[in-house]
Amino acid sequence: MSNSSCWNERYRGAPAIIEPSKLLVKFSGLFPAHGRALDIACGGGRNSVYLAGRGLRVVGIDRSWEALQQGRELARRQGRNVAWVQGDLEAVTLPIDAFDVITCFYYRHPTLYPSLRAALRSGGLLFFETFTRDQLNFSSGPRNPAHLLEPRELLQAFGDWDVLFYRETWVERGMAALVARKPKLRV
């Protein structure tokens, strides 16, 4: 499922997930007191709204307008302000040094990695969690290998940063999670 209509169909009528990612909650003490956050492939906006509730100015981007509508409704109910952007994540141009926090959950597109690296400010935090190829050993979840992380892929892409947390697991599902801080520029 990669085009907007497929994702719109998936979100249409589906119950919204409102709880933020456990990874974000676990490491919420690392968030800056203020700043800008980008939530890549934000889906129904649960993490965008959570970050806004932590005092960050948030941009949530997703290809599905149905998902973004769920996010708008969740933000409205919780009194949060989020800038919602519908866009093709495989063609998006991210501003350089624009964000203090970037999150990417359940989305893999390796050609986006250089843009994520450039868009995050020095000292900024990256939260990344998605399925690995080990997921193919389980009956549910994504089946397209192109959407699944290779072993240690996140470490290869961001391992030169300060890795604060990394995990690859295959209990109940094949997942990898990374929390990393972009090194501060040395003057």
Annotate each language-model stretch with its function.
Residues G71-R72:
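Conserved SAM-binding loop
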